[in-house]
Amino acid sequence: MNKDMWKLSPKNIAALGIGSAVFVIVGRFASIPSGLPNTNFELVYAFLAMIAMIYGPTVGFGVGFIGHVLLDLMMYGQTWWNWNFAAGFLGFFIGLYALRVNIDQGEFSAKEMVIFNVVQVVANAIVWFLLGSVGDMVLNSEPAAKVFAQAGLTTLMDGLTIAVLGTILLKLYAGSRVKKGSLHKD
């Protein structure tokens, strides 16, 4: 377990700030409408998964939450707090799995990829259905059919985005790291 992932070190604070800015940029320019109101195919969640796996749950939550708040304010002039917290907790839950993987040491095996994808699909379902949908029903008096349709489509689209693009990004990242014990002194 990498205990540094829980700390707000200068490196993690920089990752939080830069990650939030990148979240806004990618969310603004790489968002594809789905046809369902306020529900888009968001490539930014592959980036969030990568950040959460590299820096852990604290930075994962911060980038998801802050990035989503800033993106909402920029795009709509207001924010939906339950969906912002949902994005933050998606980063947090994926970041929790990062504590069990040595991705910084070049390790991301097929088994770890499968577990990562199970974790992210479950996390997507939890955050978008519970925080997103139930939050909209309680806070905004939105009809259940509408918000559960949005949550279902969001879970599917974000899960697929992370499964494909997020897994590729993480495998490339792990491949760029020096494996533990691979360097030998002659």
UniProtKB/Swiss-Prot annotation:
It is a multi-pass membrane protein. It is found in: Cell membrane. Pfam families: ECF-ribofla_trS (PF07155). It comes from the Bacteria. The chain crosses the membrane at residues 13-33, 46-66, 79-99, 114-134, 150-170. PANTHER family: UPF0397 PROTEIN BC_2624-RELATED, UPF0397 PROTEIN SPR0429. This is UPF0397 protein Ldb1710. It comes from Lactobacillus delbrueckii subsp. bulgaricus (strain ATCC 11842 / DSM 20081 / BCRC 10696 / JCM 1002 / NBRC 13953 / NCIMB 11778 / NCTC 12712 / WDCM 00102 / Lb 14).
